[in-house]
Amino acid sequence: MAKQKIRIRLKAYDHRVLDQSAEKIVETAKRSGASVSGPIPLPTEKSVYTILRAVHKYKDSREQFEMRTHKRLIDIINPTPQTVDALMRLDLPSGVDIEIKL
C-alpha cells in the first residue's frame, strides 16, 4: 500500500504569525488522526534593496532596506478524509501564503 502525503509550504514576512499558523495546522491534523512531520524551518530568504538618500547628488549617501521571507514545511502522512476536510475549513491569517501539494 502506497503512503499518501500532503506537503504544505508556508511563507510569511512575520515569523510569529507563521509559527502560529503552523501550530494550528499541526494541531488540526493530529486531532483528525493523521501523523505529522514538522513544522520544519526552511532557509529565510533575504532581499536587500539599496536606494540613494538624496534625489540628485550625494551618491555616497545610501540607505538599505531588507525584506525577510520566512518559510516552514509541514508533511501530513496518511491523511484521512476528516483531515482534508478540517484543513479546508481552517481559518489562517491573511499574511501567510499557503502552498499545498498532494
UniProtKB/Swiss-Prot annotation:
Pfam families documented for this protein: Ribosomal_S10 (PF00338)
Domain of life, source organism: Bacteria
GO molecular function, one term: structural constituent of ribosome
GO annotations of cellular component type: ribonucleoprotein complex; ribosome
Stored Gene3D superfamilies: Ribosomal protein S10 domain
Protein keywords: Ribonucleoprotein, Ribosomal protein
Coiled-coil region list: none
Main function: Involved in the binding of tRNA to the ribosomes.
NCBIfam families assigned: PRK00596.1, rpsJ_bact
Similarity field: Belongs to the universal ribosomal protein uS10 family.
PANTHER family: 30S RIBOSOMAL PROTEIN S10 FAMILY MEMBER
Name the UniProt record assigns to this protein: Small ribosomal subunit protein uS10
Annotated organism of origin: Shouchella clausii (strain KSM-K16) (Alkalihalobacillus clausii)
